[in-house]
């Protein structure tokens, strides 16, 4: 079984783990609502992306589905 000959110093251990840190989340404020949202993602309150409507509101004016 492989065993290290010398003890790894704290400096070497920390240098090895230097890239293990979590990346910061890219959060921006929406220009229209002022709410926080992820960058390059659709605004879920209005369904817009880059100033254009990409998610339509599915409002059913015909409520025949609920009647028996």
Swiss-Prot record:
Q: Which domain of life is it from?
A: Bacteria
> Which InterPro entries does UniProt cross-reference here?
Ribosomal_bL32, Ribosomal_bL32_bact, Ribosomal_zn-bd
- Keyword Ubl conjugation carried by entry: no
Annotated disulfide bonds: none
* Listed GO CC annotations: large ribosomal subunit
For this UniProt record, the keywords arranged alphabetically read as follows:
Ribonucleoprotein, Ribosomal protein
Return one GO MF term. Answer: structural constituent of ribosome
Q: Name one GO biological process term.
A: translation
The protein's matches in NCBIfam families, at most eight in alphabetical order, are given as: rpmF_bact
Q: Which family does it belong to?
A: Belongs to the bacterial ribosomal protein bL32 family.
- The name under which this protein is listed is Large ribosomal subunit protein bL32
Gene encoding the protein:
rpmF
